[in-house]
Amino acid sequence: MKLSHFNFNLPKELLAEFPAENRDESRLMVIDRQKNTIEHKMFKDVINYFDDGDVLILNNTKVFPARLYGNKEKTGARIEVFLLRELNSEQRLWDVLVDPARKIRIGNKLYFGDDDSLVAEVIDNTTSRGRTLRFLYDGSYEEFRNKLTELGETPIPKYINRDVTPEDAERYQTIYAKEEGAVAAPTAGLHFSKHLLKKLEIKGVNFAEVTLHVGLGTFNPVEVEDLSKHKMDSEELIITQEACDIVNEGKAKKKRICAVGTTSMRAIESSVSSANTLNPYEGWTNKFIFPPHDFSIANCMITNFHTPKSTLLMMISAFCGHDLMKKAYEEAIKEGYKFYSYGDAMLIL
């Protein structure tokens, strides 16, 4: 399939700038691939589609406050630094994106905090906007990380055209987030409230947690018409034996195995055995899922509504079937569903 197959026009007013008042009260589109049907529900109705022994696969990555604002030495020009990943904890080396990139060069010092309590030096250019920074900080590693947390902002996506609020620190995070390392939330999971998870647990639904630290590469636009030539950025992935046991037992019993979000789906599709079971894994994945693709583990998924031409939309097309996905998106726009990170959800059966 070609890139142009994944383009559509989205009215601006359908882009969610704020989350639903309550997590589980966003809307839910339910797509049945067997029956070729589309239904409109509320997210809390998701409980009606799961029974004893079914499995929900959750990505327990935790978003850290990755966006820093500071000033450049001498000129005092305001700059933005987006922390991507830590390269070396002892040397305080980080892979970052900078803005405005043309003004931030090797050797420059950058100052953060009202009292310039954190300083970084640019030591390398990695891409047009990418830099390697060495943070100059005298305290312990723990104090340094606390300082980053204190000065950093919740990295809500740029298309949300408003200032970050204190509420974002809580709402741009799943309630089961544990392992810090993501610069973007696994957004399908944002819809689960404690109450809803408890009700699913009481019903006998099992939860398998995986960790995929979502990077900004997930949202990189695809710029090649031939999808097979697109390269995904690598993201850190951990799948434990415990998670594999829960998933494989459910699979053996022919239960519903539901990937909560594209990140959970990419995680499990990155570590499949020759017998089509889930294997433990610790490392990196740059798996790109686009049509046609045979899914080995999950037979069901929950996801948000994605941007045109995105790799996330391509995965949904591969799982849902392209024609049914197009029909669902057309209906979502007609019915006024909210799109993107803080938007509504779909359940694909």
Curated annotation (Swiss-Prot):
SUPFAM superfamilies: QueA-like (SSF111337). The keyword Transferase applies. Pathway: tRNA modification; tRNA-queuosine biosynthesis. GO terms for cellular component: cytoplasm. The keyword Cytoplasm applies. Its EC number is 2.4.99.17. InterPro entries: QueA (IPR003699), QueA_dom1 (IPR042118), QueA_dom2 (IPR042119), QueA_sf (IPR036100). It is found in: Cytoplasm. It is an enzyme of class 2 (transferase). Transfers and isomerizes the ribose moiety from AdoMet to the 7-aminomethyl group of 7-deazaguanine (preQ1-tRNA) to give epoxyqueuosine (oQ-tRNA). This is S-adenosylmethionine:tRNA ribosyltransferase-isomerase. It comes from Flavobacterium johnsoniae (strain ATCC 17061 / DSM 2064 / JCM 8514 / BCRC 14874 / CCUG 350202 / NBRC 14942 / NCIMB 11054 / UW101) (Cytophaga johnsonae).
